[in-house]
Amino acid sequence: MTQHLFMVGARGCGKTTVGQALARVLGYAFADTDDMLWRSTGKTVAEIVAKEGWTGFRARESEILTSVTQGNAVVATGGGIILSAANRRFMRARGTVVYLHATAQELSRRLRAYPEDDQRPSLTGKPMIEEIAEVLAAREKLYQEAAHHVLDASQPPDDVVSAILQQLYPSAAS
């Protein structure tokens, strides 16, 4: 049976880092929707948003999500993938959704530590910590609704991977 594990959460929560490590441990393929979008368009998220707006970007993001058809795979999604009810239903129906939860303070710390990795334009134009807190507050219910499992992403990536494995395979962890 084909198994997809969808990593959801805010920008900077570790979806790509944790997803890659989890895929290695499980022997699954790894896919990142932002990377797939870049490969299919030749444009960064910021470039797509500048040309097509957030609505155009979200439509492309949904197309990319539904194109993930490879066998067993861990899929790191964009932070806003859950804004679409269709995307939430698709992920829940096609696999297991893991929400990597972190506080606004932790996300801000990570994004400041690796500014070159943050290629997304601001959603609100506000200072980073304010924007993160506002976006988290607006999306929390949707992340929770999408998720089969919610994990604390403030731990080191290997610890988060271990926690995910314990949630997915509780009998193997005992």
UniProtKB/Swiss-Prot annotation:
Signal peptide interval: none
Protein name listed in UniProt: Shikimate kinase 2
Comment, domains: The LID domain closes over the active site upon ATP binding.
Binding positions (substrate): D34, R58, G79, R139
Catalysis performed (reactions): shikimate + ATP = 3-phosphoshikimate + ADP + H(+)
InterPro entries in the cross-refs: P-loop_NTPase, Shikimate/glucono_kinase, Shikimate_kinase/TSH1, Shikimate_kinase_2, Shikimate_kinase_CS
Pathway: Metabolic intermediate biosynthesis; chorismate biosynthesis; chorismate from D-erythrose 4-phosphate and phosphoenolpyruvate: step 5/7
Biological processes, Gene Ontology terms: amino acid biosynthetic process; aromatic amino acid family biosynthetic process; chorismate biosynthetic process
Record-stated family: Belongs to the shikimate kinase family. AroL subfamily.
Complex and partners: Monomer.
NCBIfam families noted in UniProt: PRK03731.1
Localization, UniProt: Cytoplasm
Chain residues that bind ATP: G12, C13, G14, K15, T16, T17, R120, Q155
One Pfam family in the UniProt entry: SKI
Record: residues binding Mg(2+): T16, D32
Keyword Nucleotide-binding listed: yes
Residues covered by region (LID domain): 112-126
Main location: cytoplasm
Keywords: Amino-acid biosynthesis, Aromatic amino acid biosynthesis, ATP-binding, Cytoplasm, Kinase, Magnesium, Metal-binding, Nucleotide-binding, Transferase
Enzyme Commission (EC) number: 2.7.1.71
Known role: Catalyzes the specific phosphorylation of the 3-hydroxyl group of shikimic acid using ATP as a cosubstrate.
GO molecular function, one term: shikimate kinase activity
Cofactor(s) needed for function: Mg(2+)
Cofactor binding note from Swiss-Prot or TrEMBL: Binds 1 Mg(2+) ion per subunit.
Membrane-spanning residues: none
